[in-house]
Amino acid sequence: MKLDKNKIQISIGKNPSKTFYKLQLLLKDHFPENLKTKFSFQTASGIFTGENGQIFTDEVEKIIYLGLGETSKIKIRGVAQHFFQFGEKLKKWEGVGLEIHLPKVLTNSLSADLVVYQIVNSLEQGAYAINVLAKEYKENSKKIGNVSFILQDAAKLKEAEKGLKRGKIVSRYINGVRHIAHLPANHFTPEEFVSRSKEIAKDNGLKITVFDEPQLKKEKMGGILSVCEGSDKKAKMILLEYTPVKPITKKKLAIIGKGLTFDSGGISIKPAQDMHEMKYDMCGAATAIHAIGAIAELGLGVPVIAAIGVAENMPDAAAIKPGDVYTAYNGITVEVQNTDAEGRLVLGDVLSYVGKKFKPDYMLDLATLTGAIIISLGHEAAGVMSNSDVLTNLLKEASISSDERIWEMPLWEEYSEDLKSDIADIRNVAGRAGGSLSAAKFLERFVEPGIAWAHIDIAGTAWRKKTSGTQIGNGPTGYGVRLLVDLVEKIGKKK
């Protein structure tokens, strides 16, 4: 399964399209004098004053004016969020382009690199249709016009070019996550995960290793194997390895992803309402394989491993049952009291395998693991639980620069108390209170000593209904790709 190309041709300089709109970005407190006269009626009546999000279109001159509010309050998420709509417009405009004029005050307040990077991401996501199985998708695909950037401050051109190059690469992988995440389980199976991973490996010269059922049994990966027992789709573990041509550090990062292509809950079956959304339970794994693709294509100088466990959780006569006990890869026995807490079973085996085999300096996992994290943080941030202040701080720095929000949650020992089992070493659930935190404590049992590890619960950020900042709404977001790219850059710079 190949990764789609970028939907828009984007450049810096005069727009090459035959017909295009100019998009003029305006700061409320830096309104050009000529426009004050031109918009005297509009400003007096409040129709257009440059407030953040206000739009006024001059159809005669084909100029769109977009207000960004006051300079002192401007943030990149407040700029980028407006460009999803322009990506959507380009999709419908039949070849009409967009020439984006960036004022000097904007590229002085925020770096030209960052502004162009995040605008490109928003445009590409807005222009990327996810209704790929619809008849109208195949019949109504239109030519998308060119986009170009004009900078008022010519001294910022190199910065802008850097952001453009980075944005083109990263947005392609974000849309790659969104594409496969939105596919239903009958179109995207564990086998399709293998196919997609092979394409990413081929495109970027990555080493790939696939563990099918015989290898999983040989390695005694009881967690992954127990989850798939009720499905006719066999589980897989997929490893991707990136070795930079010019490494800038010996520190190694491992990214682990949960890949449940469908989660019915198994015998502990979920309610029927909204169960269709459980096709999104593979977003952690989707992010892991696309993030390493972006990291490799950008040529970042940090060695990275991406490892994902993929399976389907279904009820069946052969399915694992509440009360069953299995032995994990690291020898721990686990009592499964709830088969709907299955993601941690898969992650446990992958975490312990990667820790023992690769001995990474840093290791993190991304998973749509608990509904409890949505109760805590809503859809605005992922929860982070870590055994390492160093890794947590690196993630916080990456979160700020990427605008993919995280929030640190505690990993206190008390949260593991209720994981005790009366028949096995540990049980897989600990009750409703602090559910995200006890889930993280469960995973911690599978992390090798000495490894800086963080668990990132993306249940609230992996898909959403409403756009917010740099996160697109109405489906999967591709959350985590930008965060991980920036994290790798931070690791590379760390002394």
Swiss-Prot record:
Cofactor note: Binds 2 manganese ions per subunit.
Binding site for Mn(2+) 2: K258, D263, D281, E342
Record-level Gene Ontology MF annotations: manganese ion binding; metalloaminopeptidase activity
Subcellular location: Cytoplasm
GO cellular component: cytoplasm
Binding-site positions, Mn(2+) 1: D263, D340, E342
Active site per UniProt: K270, R344
One GO term (biological process): proteolysis
Keywords of this entry: Aminopeptidase, Cytoplasm, Hydrolase, Manganese, Metal-binding, Protease
Keyword Transcription appears in the UniProt entry: no
UniProt-listed Pfam families: Peptidase_M17
Classification via InterPro entries: Leucine_aapep/pepB (IPR011356), Macro_dom-like (IPR043472), Peptidase_M17_C (IPR000819), Peptidase_M17_leu_NH2_pept (IPR023042)
Disulfide bonds: none
EC number: 3.4.11.1, 3.4.11.10
Enzyme class, spelled out: hydrolase
PROSITE patterns, sorted: CYTOSOL_AP
Family that this chain belongs to: Belongs to the peptidase M17 family.
Primary role: Presumably involved in the processing and regular turnover of intracellular proteins. Catalyzes the removal of unsubstituted N-terminal amino acids from various peptides.
Protein name: Probable cytosol aminopeptidase
